[in-house]
Regions:
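Bacterial N-terminal signal peptides
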Residues: 8-21
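Boundary at the C-terminal end of the N-terminal hydrophobic targeting segment
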Residues: 22-26
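Helix-termini ("caps") and immediately adjacent flexible loops/tails
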Residues: 28-37, 86, 244-273, 319-491
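Accessory "access/gating" subregions that flank catalytic or transport cores
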Residues: 35, 40, 145-154, 165-173, ...
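Mature N-terminal segment immediately following signal peptide/propeptide cleavage
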Residues: 37-58
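Catalytic phosphate/nucleotide-handling subdomain of diverse soluble enzymes
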Residues: 53, 57, 64, 68-73, ...
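Active-site-surrounding "flap" and adjacent substrate/cofactor-binding loops of secreted or lumenal enzymes
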Residues: 59-95, 99, 106-128
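Extracytoplasmic mature domains of secreted/periplasmic and thylakoid-lumen proteins
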Residues: 103-158, 166-169
């Protein structure tokens, strides 16, 4: 993919491809947290198990409760047949296995694209499906997650459901947790969803240091842009929970009324606004009780499996795996691969957690910590980090202007003879997205139709572009594509 677009070409995104050493968060060298290996590893295992329980046990409630909440009153966590792959955990699984085999925690963009083309082709939806179609025409991360090119990217909930495992990689290091998580969630999102990534990754990292939900939430708030919408959402939910501590239904109604922002149901329940609110509410009303937290996540509804998985990860870290095992829940130690060809078919919950633990050890060491033995016991010495906003919100108009300036030469180069079909298709797509199609049509009337013909050789991309995208971004791109002369694929 020598001609594919990579972030190395663009200053706007270049930070995402740098090595971790360039981003070592500043920590006080005298301020360390020491945890026994037994405790740290138990919390990582608890976080993963909480994520799996939240994800899979809430699937019956996923996108089921919209205007009104659910009515679950009793629930016993269980995985009697073991866990299985689902997009709330298996995209992270693909990354973790690859990171184990890599010298860096921050996989390069073309490596990530290769992983998707090998393993992540089915059982993906919304922004992630759009990502996979953009990869077909040679667009690599993080541009696959640019709102200018991916109409789901400025609201999609994958900024949350692809971040939890990375929070487990950086215990007590919320800045590092957010940074690693952003590297991978930027494959599919930007903007407000990137604030959700930082919010929840930082909260998971902080859960290794305290069981106080309010302190964990404070760390999350310190990790997001002070002017982002999610800050107001979290502030509102906290206020409503304090006002109605015994009436979660009223809080749910207030969330629905204020943050159901669009007419389209899919846009709303797939958006970071309602999902962030529901997750925070579940944590506040659950107050550290694993079962109560997940019941609340189920009942708040919307994209419930996403919300329960995130809340379950946080409370799972607090409780630890040994505590969960003492509850006598039916849990079979299995992680069945039902969705990701080429990935291990013999994975268990234990081996999945082992992978996270191994990488977490590397992350701790890369940030100035160490694993040592004292009095016959193995201890992790972890540099404590203060939570901080790693990536503020950027002005979308400025981003679009920068992309247009930097991508235009590549678009023009595709007008030459002997250019590959993929390069021509990519040029047509980029021109449509960046508002350059009209000028190309006028200035190159003989070549522009050839670019469109090349793009029409990718019917799966046209399908998500012209038929499957919701919200203002989807409407904008559809209108631009049709105005440029793009034809809908034959049904």
């Amino acid at each position: 993919m020598a001609n594919a677009i990579t972030p190395k070409l663009f200053f706007l995104f270049i930070f995402l491809s740098l090595e971790p050493i360039a981003f070592a968060a500043v920590s006080n060298p005298d301020n360390f947290l020491e945890l026994s290996a037994e405790t740290l590893e138990d919390k990582i295992r608890g976080g993963l198990l909480g994520q799996l329980l939240g994800n899979l046990n809430s699937l019956p409630h996923e996108n089921k409760y919209y205007n009104e909440p659910g009515s679950v009153e009793n629930y016993t966590p269980s995985l009697p047949d073991g866990a299985r792959t689902d997009d709330d955990t298996d995209i992270e699984w693909v990354y973790i296995v690859a990171i184990q085999r890599s010298p860096t925690v921050y996989l390069q963009p073309q490596h990530i694209t290769g992983l998707w083309k090998t393993h992540i082709n089915n059982n993906i939806w919304c922004s992630n499906l759009y990502v996979r179609r953009l990869m077909d025409i040679g667009i690599d991360p993080p541009l696959t997650g640019s709102p200018a090119l991916n109409p789901w990217a400025d609201f999609n909930v994958s900024g949350q459901f692809v971040c939890e495992t990375f929070g487990l990689l950086a215990p007590a290091m919320p800045q590092t947790a957010a940074r690693i998580a952003l590297h991978y969630t930027h494959v599919s999102i930007d903007g407000e969803p990137a604030q959700a990534t930082q919010l929840f990754a930082a909260m998971i990292a902080t859960a290794f240091t305290t069981d106080d939900i309010d302190k964990i939430l404070d760390a999350g708030l310190a990790s997001i842009d002070p002017n982002c919408l999610l800050r107001q959402i979290v502030t509102d939910v906290r206020s409503w929970q304090k006002q109605y501590p015994d009436d979660w239904r009223t809080t749910r109604r207030l969330i629905r009324d204020k943050y159901t922002l669009y007419e389209n149901r899919t846009r709303n329940q797939n958006g970071c606004e309602l999902c962030t609110a529901a997750t925070i509410a579940a944590l506040l009303y659950g107050q550290g009780d694993f079962v109560k937290t997940l019941i609340c996540a189920f009942n708040f509804g919307w994209d419930a499996d996403n919300n329960a998985a995130t809340a379950g990860t946080i409370v799972g870290v607090i409780k630890g795996c040994r505590w969960m095992q003492k509850q006598n829940w039916q849990i079979k130690d299995l992680y069945r691969n039902t969705t990701r060809p080429g990935m291990p078919d013999d994975e268990t919950i234990t081996t999945f957690a082992n992978r996270i633990i191994e990488v977490a050890g590397r992350v701790i060491a890369e940030n100035g910590g160490q694993k040592l033995t004292r009095n016959g016991k193995t201890i992790y010495r972890i540099p404590l980090q203060q939570p901080a906003n790693i990536e503020p919100l950027l002005d979308p108009n400025n981003q679009l202007t920068a992309l247009r300036s930097q991508l235009k030469p590549q678009i023009l180069s595709a007008l030459a003879d002997n250019t590959s079909t993929q390069n021509q298709a990519r040029a047509a797509y980029l021109a449509i997205c960046l508002g350059l199609a009209d000028s190309l049509k006028k200035e190159h009337p003989d070549r522009w139709p050839k670019l469109l013909e090349a793009l029409e050789q990718y019917p799966q991309l046209l399908d998500v572009l012209l038929g499957g995208s919701v919200g203002p971004g989807g409407d904008r791109l559809r209108k631009a594509a049709l105005a440029a002369g793009l034809k809908k694929p034959a049904q």
